[in-house]
């Protein structure tokens, strides 16, 4: 097998590793959402508390693969903005303005919810933690997108150097860091699946918990799910702008 065929084979191995486990976990998360969330179960073919057959298991696995792909959206943004990673020493340093803004904006919504919500203390804490995780994941991606667009020259310089280095390297260090990164991607996707699952559950159940378990119509639940998915994938969709910026720098260089 030549170098090109070997690279292609490993490319598909990386994707198989990344999404095979994610499909199983995604199917499990969707099954739990259907079983535990009455609003979501009203939209699908399986009702809460009912047993499922093998065909439905297969459908859950297929849906879990889609869920895994959607949940992996933040990985794309992190991958695009990896040139922003810097070397830091262990000594304490003053946080940057971006970090201060990020922490402030991430904390303001869950803190406001804790202060203003009329739910019980346990429910307030649970919802606040989920809100914090969701806001942190989404907001961090917007910060990365903005920094990539503002530092387009550094962005292009990184990818240009990377392309030159890779063209002259065969195996060795390239295969090593790719293997490590893809293993990290696989576990990162599992993490983001859990966060997205909590986000979906909290968003669809919030009205029920805040209104004495008043049921929602299927249309209301569908609208909530669409808004959650759009919020989750919007930063990843903006990576298109980063790719166009790299292309523009390439043409003008």
Name the predicted role of every residue range.
Residues 14-39, 53-86, 97-161, 175-249:
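Alpha-helical transmembrane segments and immediately adjacent membrane-interfacial amphipathic helices
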Residues 38-47:
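Extended intrinsically disordered, low-complexity coil regions enriched in Ser, Thr, Gly, Ala
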Residues 88-93:
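Amphipathic, cytosolic membrane-interfacial segments at TM-TM junctions
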Residues 1-17, 45-46, 161-173, 250-253:
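N-terminal juxtamembrane cytosolic/stromal segments of multi-pass membrane proteins
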């Amino acid at each position: 097998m030549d170098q090109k065929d070997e690279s292609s084979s490993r490319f598909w191995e990386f994707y198989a590793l990344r999404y095979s486990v994610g499909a199983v976990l995604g199917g499990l998360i969707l099954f739990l959402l259907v079983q535990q969330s009455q609003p979501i179960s009203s939209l699908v073919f399986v009702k809460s508390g009912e047993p499922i057959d093998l065909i439905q298991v297969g459908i859950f696995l297929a849906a879990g693969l889609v869920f895994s792909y959607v949940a992996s959206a933040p990985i794309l943004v992190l991958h695009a903005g990896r040139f922003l990673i810097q070397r830091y020493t262990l000594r304490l340093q003053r946080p940057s303005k971006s970090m201060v803004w990020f922490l402030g904006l991430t904390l303001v919504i869950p803190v406001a919810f804790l202060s203003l919500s009329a739910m019980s203390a346990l429910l307030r804490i649970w919802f606040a933690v989920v809100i914090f995780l969701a806001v942190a994941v989404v907001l961090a991606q917007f910060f990365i997108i903005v920094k990539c667009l503002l530092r387009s020259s550094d962005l292009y310089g990184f990818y240009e150097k990377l392309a030159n280095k890779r063209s002259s390297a065969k195996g060795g260090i390239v295969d090593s860091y790719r293997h490590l990164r893809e293993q990290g991607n696989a576990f990162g996707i599992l993490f983001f699946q859990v966060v997205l699952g909590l986000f979906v559950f909290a968003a669809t159940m919030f009205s029920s918990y805040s209104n004495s378990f008043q049921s929602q119509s299927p249309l209301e639940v569908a609208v909530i799910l669409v808004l959650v998915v759009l919020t989750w994938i919007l930063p990843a969709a903006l990576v298109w702008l980063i790719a166009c910026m790299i292309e523009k720098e390439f043409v003008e260089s």
